[in-house]
């Protein structure tokens, strides 16, 4: 029989997800019901994503918020516009503060993104459209691009 030494586990560096939640959700279906009859062609999807990081009052606690907006259009209609602010509260335990920016910009968003993606998929489907399946996002590439833009 093995036992787990919790003292050692508590000293190990790790990220704890304390909460996940929808902060804001809006879906517009402005041309319904006419737009629902025009679903025989693939719409153009415009997608934007932003990450906001807030240092909370408790030490090493942060809120990481994904802001996702998507608009679908065809040649005749604006089919839908969806906005989602989805956030998580993270505790960075026994992690050097120099590593916090990359963890908060890459690893934490990657942890909550699948949940935000599912919400968007479900909402667009419930609005009468094919579910919007957002491709996986390389948060590491976004972080490095943003860092190189700040250096220039």
Swiss-Prot record:
Pfam families: SecB
A single Gene Ontology CC term: cytoplasm
Keyword field: Chaperone, Cytoplasm, Protein transport, Translocation, Transport
Protein localization: Cytoplasm
GO term, biological process aspect, one: protein folding
Subunit composition and interactions: Homotetramer, a dimer of dimers. One homotetramer interacts with 1 SecA dimer.
Described function: One of the proteins required for the normal export of preproteins out of the cell cytoplasm. It is a molecular chaperone that binds to a subset of precursor proteins, maintaining them in a translocation-competent state. It also specifically binds to its receptor SecA.
Record protein name field: Protein-export protein SecB
Upper classification of the organism: Bacteria, Pseudomonadati, Pseudomonadota, Alphaproteobacteria, Rickettsiales
Gene name linked to the record: secB
């Amino acid at each position: 029989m093995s036992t787990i030494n919790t003292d050692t586990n508590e000293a190990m560096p790790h990220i704890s997800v304390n909460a996940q939640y929808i902060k804001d959700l809006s879906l517009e279906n402005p041309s319904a019901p006419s737009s629902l009859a025009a679903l025989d062609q693939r719409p153009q999807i415009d997608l934007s994503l932003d990450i906001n990081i807030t240092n909370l009052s408790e030490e090493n606690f942060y809120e990481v918020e994904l802001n996702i907006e998507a608009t679908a259009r065809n040649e005749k209609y604006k089919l839908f516009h969806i906005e989602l602010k989805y956030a998580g509260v993270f505790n960075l335990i026994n992690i050097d503060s120099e590593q916090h920016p990359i963890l908060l910009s890459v690893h934490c968003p990657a942890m909550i993104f699948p949940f935000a993606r599912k919400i968007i998929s479900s909402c667009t489907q419930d609005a009468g459209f094919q579910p919007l399946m957002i491709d996986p996002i390389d948060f590491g590439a976004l972080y490095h691009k943003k860092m190189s833009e700040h250096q220039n």
